[in-house]
């Protein structure tokens, strides 16, 4: 076998040079809040010899500076989920960032072409492919605009609005679509496809749900930290300044995969009746007897009533209140001062303290209360999300708590809780269409909600599915009118408003780049072509006259 000869001294010198470059990179202000648990040497060893500069990293830099400015000014980058190139081209005129929703991709753009609700069960490359779809459109419209402007005089350019089509894209990475290696590969896909940032949530991958569905199963705190570390490590290997958004679904979570992390112990539910027995064993025994359906559900309901399901601190407080103790309030305070949502007290430590205060071993068993699938019962909430947000902060650029309602007071509680420990932490907020906005607040409060959240530190806010909903509304409205009044529906409710509002897609040939392509044809054919798309006979000449006929 013929091996390639290599200069060992040069190889070592190149390695040391790269290590020095990485250390210098990490010393930049961009990384002042970022914690890494690996070394520059580790990253240099994982890189190949061919250096590839990804343009998405420039977009990451742009996004970071954008959010830095918003943070300083207490303002907000607010956006919504884009479905296609039409969306991003129109959004670019008014909004300074773009969101790509996994929910929307699941229903409209899976690479399997099979629609689905938001369960993240689509192929792993689905959202990265949508990012690339939109990123290529951004690049194309940017090229098209540049040529059009540079064909103008300076005076004409001065009077022609400039559109920044290259708005940074933040995309949905769900739970990472698997373990650590899957997350590393998924991150690489996003970097290659044009994402400036991605978000990842602390749900278990096999049971992932939309943030506004029931039955969410969390992973332990450290497991999600490992995911965030994997994202940063992958980005470091590929030389990217990718932003990472850590989402927690703990506010409404009801299950967790494991009790391994002591930071989760406060929120894990157990049985307080030693006579209740093991639920999973009871259910398995019933199924072995041929019991299913409503009867099986009844058995679970009866067990739940009997088990006395509680959090451990609730069991301790109930014992103190019901027992023969002097100065009960002082005992409760002594316990809750050391055992609370943000204390990170392990269950072992909490039990020891409870026995010191009550003289009893209070029965509490979280194993017998496990769900049939083996998951532990969990009672999240805002303070749980604060605990997780604080834990994730050193490894993420932004923190996002998924919530059930657009509740300003809850958003403030979360922001205040996180910032009490990490004062300069950036926050993100989902202005979800799953909320009933008109029921939640009056119109005047809706108008100021984004700004009010911005004052709390929510520098990036987004309506996940506005692209889906606005498209559905527009098409439903047009299809309805078209079915009744034919071409009048198009002429009067689509085309004429496009003309009056200056929506450039009315000249869809030009919008799609026909002039730009004609320029390419002329360039490679010596300046003359008889096959120009926008030559004599093009029907868009009709739009030089914009007055509608009545």
Curated annotation (Swiss-Prot):
<dbReference type="InterPro" id="IPR015813">
    <property type="entry name" value="Pyrv/PenolPyrv_kinase-like_dom"/>
</dbReference>
<protein>
    <recommendedName>
        <fullName>Isocitrate lyase</fullName>
        <ecNumber>4.1.3.1</ecNumber>
        <ecNumber>4.1.3.30</ecNumber>
    </recommendedName>
</protein>
<dbReference type="InterPro" id="IPR039556">
    <property type="entry name" value="ICL/PEPM"/>
</dbReference>
<comment type="pathway">
    <text>Carbohydrate metabolism; glyoxylate cycle; (S)-malate from isocitrate: step 1/2.</text>
</comment>
<feature type="binding site">
    <location>
        <position position="172"/>
    </location>
    <ligand>
        <name>Mg(2+)</name>
    </ligand>
</feature>
<dbReference type="GO" id="GO:0009514">
    <property type="term" value="C:glyoxysome"/>
</dbReference>
<feature type="binding site">
    <location>
        <position position="464"/>
    </location>
    <ligand>
        <name>substrate</name>
    </ligand>
</feature>
<dbReference type="GO" id="GO:0004451">
    <property type="term" value="F:isocitrate lyase activity"/>
</dbReference>
<dbReference type="GO" id="GO:0006097">
    <property type="term" value="P:glyoxylate cycle"/>
</dbReference>
<dbReference type="InterPro" id="IPR040442">
    <property type="entry name" value="Pyrv_kinase-like_dom_sf"/>
</dbReference>
<dbReference type="Pfam" id="PF00463">
    <property type="entry name" value="ICL"/>
</dbReference>
<keyword id="KW-0816">Tricarboxylic acid cycle</keyword>
<keyword id="KW-0576">Peroxisome</keyword>
<keyword id="KW-0460">Magnesium</keyword>
<dbReference type="GO" id="GO:0046421">
    <property type="term" value="F:methylisocitrate lyase activity"/>
</dbReference>
<keyword id="KW-0456">Lyase</keyword>
<feature type="binding site">
    <location>
        <begin position="101"/>
        <end position="103"/>
    </location>
    <ligand>
        <name>substrate</name>
    </ligand>
</feature>
<feature type="short sequence motif" description="Microbody targeting signal">
    <location>
        <begin position="548"/>
        <end position="550"/>
    </location>
</feature>
<comment type="subunit">
    <text>Homotetramer.</text>
</comment>
<dbReference type="InterPro" id="IPR018523">
    <property type="entry name" value="Isocitrate_lyase_ph_CS"/>
</dbReference>
<feature type="binding site">
    <location>
        <begin position="430"/>
        <end position="434"/>
    </location>
    <ligand>
        <name>substrate</name>
    </ligand>
</feature>
<keyword id="KW-0479">Metal-binding</keyword>
<feature type="binding site">
    <location>
        <begin position="211"/>
        <end position="212"/>
    </location>
    <ligand>
        <name>substrate</name>
    </ligand>
</feature>
<feature type="active site" description="Proton acceptor">
    <location>
        <position position="210"/>
    </location>
</feature>
<comment type="similarity">
    <text>Belongs to the isocitrate lyase/PEP mutase superfamily. Isocitrate lyase family.</text>
</comment>
<keyword id="KW-0330">Glyoxysome</keyword>
<comment type="function">
    <text>Catalyzes the formation of succinate and glyoxylate from isocitrate, a key step of the glyoxylate cycle, which operates as an anaplerotic route for replenishing the tricarboxylic acid cycle. Required for growth on ethanol or acetate, but dispensable when fermentable carbon sources are available. Also acts on 2-methylisocitrate.</text>
</comment>
<feature type="binding site">
    <location>
        <position position="247"/>
    </location>
    <ligand>
        <name>substrate</name>
    </ligand>
</feature>
<keyword id="KW-0329">Glyoxylate bypass</keyword>
<dbReference type="GO" id="GO:0006099">
    <property type="term" value="P:tricarboxylic acid cycle"/>
</dbReference>
<dbReference type="InterPro" id="IPR006254">
    <property type="entry name" value="Isocitrate_lyase"/>
</dbReference>
<dbReference type="GO" id="GO:0046872">
    <property type="term" value="F:metal ion binding"/>
</dbReference>
